UniProtKB/Swiss-Prot annotation:
Phosphoenolpyruvate binds at K26, G99, R127, Q172, R347, R388, K413. It is found in: Cytoplasm. This is 3-phosphoshikimate 1-carboxyvinyltransferase. It is an enzyme of class 2 (transferase). Keywords: Amino-acid biosynthesis, Aromatic amino acid biosynthesis, Cytoplasm, Transferase. Monomer. Catalyzes the transfer of the enolpyruvyl moiety of phosphoenolpyruvate (PEP) to the 5-hydroxyl of shikimate-3-phosphate (S3P) to produce enolpyruvyl shikimate-3-phosphate and inorganic phosphate. 3-phosphoshikimate binds at K26, S27, R31, S170, S171, Q172, S199, E314, H343. It comes from Mycobacterium marinum (strain ATCC BAA-535 / M).
Length: 431
C-alpha cells in the first residue's frame, strides 16, 4: 500500500492548466455508511450510496461494519448497506489510521450483544480516544482499555441519557456519539466541556446528515447537542466530491500562476473545505463558479498571509505549502491548529521539520505555525504515513525541482488515484 521507492514530485516550470475530477468525500462517505448501518440495524431497511469514495479509510469502515455483522454490497462507488448487528465470535475491528473508524464505530458496537475488540496501525495508538471511551462508560457501556487496543462489551442496547465530554482534541468524539444517539433507548444529549471546539463544521455536517436520515437533532445551544430517540430512515445517499482532496489541486493553480478547474463542485456544501476559497482569494487568486465546476486562476505572485484554520485544520498541510512558496521574505501565520498534534502524525512538527529540511523557515507556536518564505532547495520530503503531508510535498515539488516524497502511497488513505491525477494535472491532461 505504501511506495517503497521515493516519488519524484512533478516539477512545473510553467503555469499548470488542467481540469480535475476528484472522487467522493471521505467524511460524507463514512458518515453515510454509519447512518445506513444504523437504519438497517433498526430493521428499517437497506440504503444505497452513490459516489462513495473507495480508499483505505472508507474500505476500513466497510470492513468494520461487516465485522459487526452488517452487509455492504457493491463494487466501486455504488454501495448497498443492509443486515443487522450480529458480530461473530472474537470480532475485531481494524481502525488502521482512520479517525472516523476509531471514533464512529465504538458507539455503534455498543449496540451489539457481543464483545468487539478495536485495534489499528501503530501510529493510531497515539491518536486521542480516551474521552470517547469514558463517555461510553458514562452511558453504561462496559469498555476495557483507555486507548488502542480496547474492547467494547455491548449488551444489545444503550440506555442513553446525558454525557459530558471534552472534545477539544477532536470533533469526531461528538460526531461519533451523535451518529448512534437516535438508536439509544432514551436518545442522547452531548455537552462539550472543554476549550474551543476544533473542526466544528464537521459536527454541523453530522447534524445535517442525521436530519436527512429523519433524526430529530437540537443544536440550538452552543456546545450542546440533543438527539431524540427514533428510527433512522433508509434512503439513497449521493456523496459529493471530496473538497478537501480538491484543495491540493487548487493550490497548484496558485503556486504556478495557472488555472485549475474542479468538476462537480457542489453549489451549496456543508463540507468545511469550501472555506479554502476565501483563503485563495486573499492570495490574489480569481475564483469562478462555471456551471457545476469551480475554477481557480492563480496570481503571478502572492505574499504571506494570516489565517485561522481552527475550523478547517485538515487544510493545514496544503496551506503551509502555499505559505512556504509565497514571495521570499513574506511571513504567514497559521493559527488555531494545536489539535493537529494528535492527527495521523504531529502535523505541526512534521511540517516544520520538512519545510526546514528544504531550507525553509518554519517555526511552531503554541497553536500553529509561523512560516517565512525563503527559496527552497531540492531534497527528500517525508510523509510520515500521512496523506495530507504527502500531498503537501507534491505542492512544494511543483515549484522546487528535485523534491522526492518518500511515501506517496500514504495518499491511498483518502485518494489512491492521487499520483496519477497529479501527474496528469501537471501534464495538462487530467480530466
Amino acid at each position: 500500500m505504501s511506495s517503497i521507492e521515493p516519488w519524484p514530485a512533478p516539477f512545473a516550470p510553467t503555469p499548470v492548466h488542467a481540469t480535475v475530477t476528484v472522487p467522493g468525500s471521505k467524511s460524507q462517505t463514512n458518515r453515510t455508511l454509519v447512518l445506513a448501518a444504523l437504519a438497517a440495524a433498526q430493521g428499517q431497511g437497506s440504503s444505497t450510496i452513490t459516489g462513495a469514495l473507495r480508499s483505505r479509510d472508507t474500505d476500513l469502515m466497510i470492513e468494520a461494519l461487516q465485522t459487526l455483522g452488517l452487509r455492504v454490497d457493491g463494487t466501486g462507488s455504488e454501495l448497498t448497506v443492509s443486515g443487522r448487528i450480529r458480530p461473530g465470535p472474537e470480532a475485531r475491528v481494524d481502525c488502521g489510521l482512520a479517525g472516523t473508524v476509531l471514533r464512529f464505530v465504538p458507539p455503534l458496537a455498543a449496540l451489539s450483544a457481543a464483545p468487539i475488540t478495536f485495534d489499528g496501525d501503530e501510529q493510531a495508538r497515539a491518536r486521542p480516544i480516551a474521552p470517547l471511551l469514558d463517555a461510553l462508560r458514562g452511558l453504561g457501556v462496559p469498555v476495557d482499555g483507555a486507548g488502542l487496543p480496547f474492547r467494547v462489551q455491548g449488551t444489545g442496547s444503550v440506555a442513553g441519557g446525558t454525557v459530558a465530554i471534552d472534545a477539544s482534541a477532536s470533533s469526531q468524539f461528538v460526531s461519533g456519539l451523535l451518529l448512534s444517539g437516535a438508536s439509544f433507548t432514551d436518545g442522547l444529549t452531548v455537552q462539550h466541556t472543554g476549550s474551543e471546539l476544533p473542526s466544528a463544521p464537521h459536527i454541523a455536517m453530522t447534524v445535517q446528515m442525521l436530519r436527512q436520515a429523519g433524526v430529530d437533532v437540537d443544536d440550538s445551544i452552543p456546545n450542546r447537542w440533543l438527539v431524540r430517540p427514533g428510527a433512522l430512515r433508509p434512503r439513497h445517499w449521493d456523496v459529493e466530491p471530496d473538497l478537501t482532496n480538491a484543495v491540493a489541486f487548487l493550490a497548484a493553480a496558485v503556486v504556478t500562476g495557472g488555472t485549475v478547474t474542479i468538476t462537480g463542485w457542489p453549489a451549496d456544501s456543508v463540507q468545511p473545505a469550501k472555506n479554502i476559497l476565501d483563503i485563495l482569494q486573499t492570495l490574489n487568486s480569481t475564483v469562478r463558479h462555471i456551471d457545476s465546476c469551480l475554477q481557480v486562476q492563480g496570481p503571478q505572485t502572492y505574499r504571506g498571509f494570516d489565517v485561522d484554520l481552527r475550523d478547517v485544520g485538515e487544510l493545514t498541510p496544503s496551506v503551509a505549502a502555499l505559505a512556504a512558496l509565497a514571495s521570499p521574505g513574506s511571513v504567514s501565520r497559521l493559527a488555531g491548529i494545536a489539535h493537529l498534534r494528535g492527527h495521523e502524525t504531529d502535523r505541526l512538527a512534521a511540517l516544520s521539520t520538512e519545510i526546514n529540511r528544504l531550507g525553509g523557515n518554519c517555526e511552531q507556536t503554541s497553536d500553529g505555525l509561523v512560516i517565512t518564505a525563503t527559496p527552497l532547495r531540492p531534497g527528500s520530503w517525508r510523509a510520515y504515513a500521512d496523506h495530507r503531508m504527502a500531498m503537501a510535498g507534491a505542492i512544494v515539488g511543483l515549484r522546487v525541482a528535485g523534491v522526492e516524497v518518500d511515501d506517496i502511497g500514504a495518499t491511498s488513505k483518502t485518494l489512491p488515484e492521487f499520483p496519477q491525477l497529479w501527474t496528469e494535472m501537471v501534464e495538462g491532461s487530467s480530466g
